[in-house]
Amino acid sequence: MSKVDNIEQKVIKIIADNQGKKIEEISVDLRFAEDLGVDSLSTVEIMMEIEKEFGVDVPDEEATKIKKVADVVNYIKEHKS
């Protein structure tokens, strides 16, 4: 399994756990608000968990640009040390 696949799987698991969904229900194409029904509080919780899991800092101005699951995966790939 590649590093990217591993990041993607972890991100999907975090979102699924937060939203009470099955992992199979989440894909990188989905949008947080429109497709998954993630509200602003849940978005903050998800981003805090992402920061903790991957050791990355996601400033608020960057977090507001994240609209899809793929955006999270790409952000981690770009900023993970």
From Swiss-Prot:
Note the Gene3D superfamilies from the entry: ACP-like
For the modification O-(pantetheine 4'-phosphoryl)serine, which residues carry it? S40
What's an example GO cellular component term for this entry? cytoplasm
Q: Give the subcellular location.
A: Cytoplasm
Recorded superkingdom = Bacteria
Q: Does the keyword Lipid metabolism apply?
A: yes
* Pathway field: Lipid metabolism; fatty acid biosynthesis
User: What post-translational modification information does the record give?
Assistant: 4'-phosphopantetheine is transferred from CoA to a specific serine of apo-ACP by AcpS. This modification is essential for activity because fatty acids are bound in thioester linkage to the sulfhydryl of the prosthetic group.
- Its primary localisation, in coarse terms, equals cytoplasm
Lipid metabolism as a keyword of this entry, yes or no, is: yes
**Annotated keywords:** Cytoplasm, Fatty acid biosynthesis, Fatty acid metabolism, Lipid biosynthesis, Lipid metabolism, Phosphopantetheine, Phosphoprotein
UniProt domain Carrier: residue ranges: 2-80
In terms of Pfam families, this protein maps to: PP-binding
Q: Listed GO molecular functions?
A: acyl binding; acyl carrier activity
Task: Cite the HAMAP family for this sequence.
Answer: Acyl_carrier
Concerning its family, UniProt says: Belongs to the acyl carrier protein (ACP) family.
What does this protein's UniProt record list under function?
Carrier of the growing fatty acid chain in fatty acid biosynthesis.
- Its recorded name reads Acyl carrier protein
What's the gene?
Answer: acpP
